[in-house]
Structure formats: C-alpha cells, structure tokens
Amino acid sequence: MNDLVDTTEMYLRTIYDLEEEGVTPLRARIAERLEQSGPTVSQTVSRMERDGLLRVAGNRHLELTTKGRAMAIAVMRKHRLAERLLVDVIGLPWEEVHAEACRWEHVMSEDVERRLIKVLNNPTTSPFGNPIPGLLDLGAGPDASAANAKLVRLTELPSGSPVAVVVRQLTEHVQDDIDLITRLKDTGVVPNARVTVETSPAGNVIIIIPGHENVTLPHEMAHAVKVEKV
C-alpha cells in the first residue's frame, strides 16, 4: 500500500479516535496526535476534502462524509481485530500492541478480517475494551458500538470524594503513550478491573488500587478512559 493511502487512513482513524474520545476534531488536534506540522496537516485535509472524505465546517470542525466514515470504520475495525490477534494468539506485550496494529490496519484484507473473526471466536471489543466497529458490514456481529450507554469518562465523575468504578475502555490515545499504558498494566488498571478514583484539586484523576502505587492521570488522559460506576 502506498504512503498516500496510509496517510489518508491515518487521518481518518485519528478523526474517528477524537470523536470516540469526545474531542472536537480540528486540524490542530491531528497535528498533535500525528506529530505533523500545521501546513502538512492543512494540505492533507484539503486533499481529503477534495476527495470527498471529509468537510471543514464553519467552526473549523472536521466532519467525516458518509464515504470517509465508512473508510474510518473499516480501518478501526482492522486495527482492533489486529490488536485481538496480537494479544490473544501471538501474546505480544500490551505496550507494543497498539503500534503494531497501526501497521496491520493498512494491509489487512476483508477476507482476512472474516477469518480472524472466526479464529478469535467473534470478538466485539479490543483487548483494551474498545468496541470493534463495523462488524455488521462483514456479516458478523453483534456490533458492540451501542454498548457504551452506561459508561462515563473519568473526568465526568464527581469530585471531592472517592468513587468506585470498573475500568471498561482505554482509548487509542492512552495506548499511544507507551509509558502510561505500561504503568496502567503493571498496576492492574485494565478492562474489567475494579478501582477507586479521586479527582484532585488540580483536576487530575488519581486511580487507587490496594497493594499498588497510585496512578495519577492528567485531565487529557483521564478524559480518554471510560469506566462504569459500581
């Protein structure tokens, strides 16, 4: 696959990531996430707009078109199926999984996806708890995207007192920080783990697990962790 297609798919998935996290997709956010210059991002966004993959709204918000969203969903589906394979079958260390899946997402065919779904026993979420979108497009399912109604972001929890929660999702942005995802794994902050959280006066979120050192997340990262209240 050529670099142009890779770049397009990376941009589409990044916009999809931002939407999942509840962050407004702007060119500045893409520049931060992909570590690219402002002019490079603007040029790529303009090309993608000409190609009918997105539109730039009046408030500079990037909106995926129907065509662009379908492509973004397909890329994310491949990414999260790859993550499942890398963890469940290959046994790759958690902190290496996201970066490796970022490579696989650009080269996996739909035929391989369908075979993976069977081999992996019809998964609906990634190892990090995130829903695998677009399964129905492959004739598989159920689609897990609607299973998030009870979930809240760590930043949405009330401050002032400890709150017991179950960790459900660590988004792509969290996984992209190797030091952080390693620390979360080592302290047991993984999907389905029960933890206690507190919000500090500075707005950071402190995760408390008995027998482990507390983990403090800055607001940006806490926003990217979804939990369910106990």
Swiss-Prot record:
Q: Name one Pfam family in it.
A: Fe_dep_repr_C
GO MF term (any one): DNA binding
Question: Where does this one sit in the cell?
Answer: Cytoplasm
Quote the cellular component terms of the Gene Ontology held in the record.
Answer: cytoplasm
- Briefly state the protein's biological role: Metal-dependent DNA-binding protein that controls transcription of many genes involved in iron metabolism.
What family does the Swiss-Prot or TrEMBL record give for this protein? Belongs to the DtxR/MntR family.
Protein name, per record: Iron-dependent repressor IdeR
State the organism of origin.
Mycobacterium leprae (strain TN)
Originating gene: ideR
